[in-house]
C-alpha cells in the first residue's frame, strides 16, 4: 500500500490525527483501540492480530518517527511516474484507511507498464496476508 507522496488522495482527517503521534507504538492498549481505524482490514476487531503485529515492530525514537512524517509531507513522485518503463506491480488494499485504494489506481494509471493487484484487506496486507501477497509477487516476477 503506497501512494505517490504528497499529492495523493489523503486519509480521513481522523486517521491522520491518530498518525500524528507515535503513542500507538508505546501503549499497546491504545494501539489496540485504534489499529482498525488506521490500518483497516484484518486488524479491525482483532486484538490478537494487533498484538502479534506489535511483537514484530521495533520502536526507534520519537525523533525518527517525526522525521518519517516530515519526509512524507514534502515529496511526490507524480511528475516522474510516466518515466518508469519497467514492469511494475502495484498492490493496494481495498480497506486501507491510511492510504485509500484510489492511490493504487493513480499509480497504476500513470506508470506505463503497471499491473494493479487488489487485496481484500487493509494497509498491512503484506503482514496479514503474507503468503497470498508473496504468491502474487512471485507470480509477477516470474
Predicted regions and their residues:
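Acidic catalytic loop of the alpha/beta-hydrolase fold
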Residues: 95-99, 124
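Catalytic active-site module of serine/aspartate enzymes centered on a nucleophile-bearing elbow/loop
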Residues: 114-142
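Conserved alpha/beta-hydrolase catalytic His-Asp/Glu region
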Residues: 27-75, 79-80
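Short beta-strand/loop motif that positions the catalytic acidic residue
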Residues: 84, 90-92, 96
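Residue-level signal for the nucleotide or nucleotide-sugar donor/cofactor binding architecture
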Residues: 60, 99, 128
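Short alpha-helix in the alpha/beta-hydrolase fold that links the catalytic acid
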Residues: 86, 100-109
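Flexible "cap/lid" loop of the alpha/beta hydrolase fold
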Residues: 1-23
Amino acid at each position: 500500500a503506497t501512494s505517490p507522496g504528497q499529492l495523493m488522495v489523503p486519509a480521513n482527517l481522523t486517521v491522520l490525527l491518530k498518525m500524528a503521534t507515535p503513542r500507538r507504538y508505546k501503549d499497546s492498549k491504545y494501539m489496540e483501540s485504534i489499529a482498525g481505524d488506521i490500518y483497516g482490514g484484518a486488524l479491525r476487531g482483532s486484538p490478537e492480530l494487533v498484538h502479534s503485529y506489535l511483537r514484530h515492530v521495533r520502536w526507534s525514537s520519537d525523533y525518527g518517527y517525526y522525521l518519517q512524517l516530515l519526509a512524507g509531507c514534502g515529496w511526490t513522485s507524480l511528475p516522474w511516474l510516466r518515466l518508469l518503463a519497467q514492469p511494475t506491480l502495484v498492490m493496494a488494499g481495498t480497506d486501507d484507511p491510511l492510504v485509500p485504494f484510489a492511490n493504487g489506481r493513480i499509480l497504476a494509471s500513470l506508470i506505463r507498464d503497471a499491473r494493479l493487484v487488489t487485496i481484500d484487506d487493509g494497509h498491512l496486507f503484506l503482514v496479514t496476508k503474507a503468503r497470498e501477497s508473496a504468491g502474487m509477487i512471485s507470480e509477477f516476477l516470474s
